Each structure stands twice: as structure tokens, then as C-alpha cells.
Amino acid sequence: MTDHSSDKTALVLFSGGQDSATCLAWALARFARVETIGFDYGQRHLIELECRARLLDGFRAISDDWAAKLGDNHTLTIPTLAEISDTALTRDVAIAMGADGLPNTFVPGRNLIFLNFAAALAYRRGITDIVGGMCETDYSGYPDCRNDTIQALQTALSLGMARDITLHTPLMWRDKAATWQLAQDLGGDALVDLIREDSHTCYLGERGARHDWGYGCGECPACRLRAKGWIEYASGI
């Protein structure tokens, strides 16, 4: 379950969703200490943020080693992002595809802003390793999730802070089925069950409908990706 390959501390972008929970387990397997950061940016619901505390409690219950490694959990409020983002994640509007081929769930600059704030916090705390759940395999086409974007930002952050910053994206080339499998490899059935029960992916914030893969509306793009990945993972495809 653990791989003591580093005596360093990592900061994980931890939203309370499936991907960030899996990334947290990945970081706990590789770093001596792990801190987490989440963002209240005026999203239309706060379900994911509410899931964070339950997930962290679950991680501590799964492994004494993980419990010992888990450090501070930070939450930053960025209301300005919602003020300049007219999207389905920050407004009560129907999810639809735009003329540019992107769904209106895309919040322009969100990951760029998150990573800049995370890097600023990491700098103050002497951390140079930041972990995020960005992925360009099973994803909605968001340009700020692409590997080229992350690599460019890593260079910019390192130059701007005069410090070698490493942005780790362990899910970048994994589809959702492989992400479920990674959770299994890192924490066994206990971690998979925790992610199913207590993580949240649904864009609409639905927690009333329970599926094999967890809670959600089952219809939004995020739910469909999560469900498809679960079916493929569970069937061994």
C-alpha cells in the first residue's frame, strides 16, 4: 500500500471528487507527508467540499500509515472566479455544448488559477511537489487539463518562484477504468468503497441517487464518464 520513495512533502489539489481522492492515495504512497488544498470558488453547489472531510476521515481509518502522513487541509476562497465565469458550474443553467466544442461546464482558467494559488501556498510552506488530477484521456476536453498546459505552467511557476516546482499528474494518461484500478492497487477494496460512497463527481450535486459507482444524477458528462469507467473496471475490460 505504501512506497517510501521520498522524504518530501506534497500538496494535493483535493476537491472531494474521485480523481483527487485517487491522487491523494497516490501521493500518500510516495511522500513522507501530504497536505491537501481545496477551493471554494462560487461553484453552484458545495457537495464536493463537504465530501472532503469525510474522505479524509476515511483515509485515516483505512491506514495508520496514511493517518500519520496526512497533514494540514487548506481551503481557499476565490469568489472572483465565479464573478467572471458564466458557466454551468457557477450558474444554475442547463449543461450544454458550446459552439467551440466545449461543454459550458468549462470554467476558463480554473486549473491555472488553482495551481497558481496552490504553488503560492506551497512556496510559503516549503513544498515543491504539487499533485493534481488533471487528465486528457477520459475528460470533457478542457484545455487546462492537457499535459502541454500543465508542463508549460510548471515551467512558468518554477521561473516565477525561482524554485523548482514539480506538478505531478498521475492520472494524465489514465482513463476512468484505469483510475478505478489505481485506487484498487493503492488501497484495495477499502479505498474503492470509500471513493464510491464518499467522493462526489456529479456536476449537479445530486446525492439522492445511488449507483454502483457512487452518487450522482447519472446524466451529466462527469457522471457518464465515472459510470463508464466503473463498468469497464468492474467487468475487467
Swiss-Prot record:
Its EC number is 6.3.4.20. ATP binds at residues 14-24. Keywords: ATP-binding, Ligase, Metal-binding, Nucleotide-binding, Queuosine biosynthesis, Zinc. Binds 1 zinc ion per subunit. GO terms for molecular function: ATP binding; ligase activity, forming carbon-nitrogen bonds; zinc ion binding. Pathway: Purine metabolism; 7-cyano-7-deazaguanine biosynthesis. One of its GO terms (biological process) is queuosine biosynthetic process. It comes from the Bacteria. Its cofactor is Zn(2+). Zn(2+) binds at residues 202, 217, 220, 223. It catalyses: 7-carboxy-7-deazaguanine + NH4(+) + ATP = 7-cyano-7-deazaguanine + ADP + phosphate + H2O + H(+). HAMAP family: QueC. PANTHER family: 7-CYANO-7-DEAZAGUANINE SYNTHASE (PTHR42914:SF1). Catalyzes the ATP-dependent conversion of 7-carboxy-7-deazaguanine (CDG) to 7-cyano-7-deazaguanine (preQ(0)). Belongs to the QueC family. This is 7-cyano-7-deazaguanine synthase. It comes from Rhodopseudomonas palustris (strain ATCC BAA-98 / CGA009).
